Amino acid sequence: MKPGIKISKRYSARNASVITVLLLLIYLIYINKETIQTKYQGSRINHDSGGDSTKDKTHTFTIKEIHFRPLDEKTQSYGSLQVTPEFVNMAKSEFEQNVAVASGDNEDLYDKQLWSASIKSNPWTHQFTLKQGSIKMKRMVNRDPDYVESFLDYAHENPEMARKVHLDWVDESVLAPNVTDKETVISLALMSSNAYVRLPYEGDWRNLSDWNNDLNPDLSVGIGWDSDGVRGHIFSNDDSSVIVIALKGTSAQGLPGSGEDETTDNDKLNDNVLFSCCCARVSYLWKTACDCYVKSYTCDEKCLEQELVRKDRYYQAVLDIYRSVVTAHPNSAIWITGHSLGGALASLLGRTFGAPAVAFEAPGELLATKRLHLPMPPGLPAYQEGVWHIGHTADPIFMGTCNGASSSCSIAGYAMETSCHSGKVCVYDVVTDKGWHVNMLNHRIHTVIDGILTDYDTVAKCKTPDACHDCFNWNYVKGRDVPKKHKSSSSTASSTSAETSTLTVGPSPPEKTTTSCIGRNWIGICTEYGI
């Protein structure tokens, strides 16, 4: 027999064996496809999905960590503080001491401490009860912070191209707080209130920054506490299967009941960038919060978008807080809450990563959502929203009526010009039901808890907000080059003729002198002029 024929038969036998093995593998994969698919989906999606078996389960939460992300990371490190028994005793003693000092005026105490007068327990030892539910949500398949933030960076550099990027979306059942349960809503509001409570300056802060202090020996860098930063209080249930992030809201001297601390100036700056039409350019009397104003009712849109994502702005800070929490709890369901500015940031953060978020008395954040180019699934139905805005009709900040030169917000230096919310709104009509008057004092978190949430027998019904459009009278341009309006040929000719006759008849008119105001009193009247 020829050698070539032996080789051919040997290869044929080997090929037949390989084909047999492949067919066997394909058969095994086919009969076990459901098991393989389940394991694959479990590895690529966070373990916050739940079915009917987990519905209406009640959890008890306590505060576990405090995160503080500074705005200037060159002089301060991002740190976290573990809430240990030693810290609780120290914080509890300080809070009780403040209560004793202010025992003659409890209302003033709670204005400063931002803790409900109806809750007798200490904010550092209180146990929060939340009932979970299962909701249908449409969100991105890949919600890893690295992937999401890289997409956002690309969207800000190339917004037109980013709209053409095909993102993978998934419909799934997600664990979420049951906002139809009264005790759950009150507990979330108390968590938001807890984020305002002043911290003792002492504590064993842990460095979460990515840089090594040994490489920067000339920098006097502290960890955890600074005058400029964002604070997030982290709550966990017994088995850490559910984590709640409560973001601190606005502290301001001009907003009663919002507390006063070191973050006041930056809180106002971020409020004015997030919730104004253009850098808080309310009138010529105002100093703008950024340099995007072009001329009357004209604003540089690209400049505004870049302002929102600066590293020293609050949105970037809460992205870092979320990243740290998810890294520490990769298999936990993450819920987010907050009051006022903290509520708006909670909504933006929940929208970014597809996490359930409950906001209390937040200003309208739909405009900021669009400017940040947050991922929005096409044709998202209202029932698949995971963002809830809880508020009442006597709060002008939540209702979007705290604007205008004579408003309380404007007098305090806040340009709250937005009124449109994303997600769903749950509104208590206290003006009709209780006869309340619209007043900025009603924006206080403990007023909401004590006067509304605990007083009503049922929670407000959540619904999709009506169609809304903020800043409709503003013109937004891409870049500083504003297109000039072209005049007709007849008007141009008449203008040229007028200029020629002016130059040939008699002496030229005297030059006009312009004056500018270089000093104003506290109500805006000019008291000193300069040439």
From Swiss-Prot:
Residue numbers on the Cytoplasmic membrane side: 1-11
SUPFAM superfamilies, per the entry: alpha/beta-Hydrolases
Gene3D superfamilies cross-referenced by the UniProt entry: alpha/beta hydrolase (3.40.50.1820)
Record's bilayer topology term: Single-pass type II membrane protein
Subcellular location: Endosome, Multivesicular body membrane; Prevacuolar compartment membrane
Disordered: region residues: 482-513
Reaction it catalyzes: a triacylglycerol + H2O = a diacylglycerol + a fatty acid + H(+)
Domain of life: Eukaryota
GO MF annotation list: phospholipase activity; triacylglycerol lipase activity
PANTHER family in the cross-refs: LIPASE ATG15-RELATED
Summary of subunit composition and partner proteins: Binds to both phosphatidylinositol (PI) and phosphatidylinositol 3,5-bisphosphate (PIP2).
Family: Belongs to the AB hydrolase superfamily. Lipase family.
Protein name, per record: Putative lipase ATG15
Species name: Kluyveromyces lactis (strain ATCC 8585 / CBS 2359 / DSM 70799 / NBRC 1267 / NRRL Y-1140 / WM37)
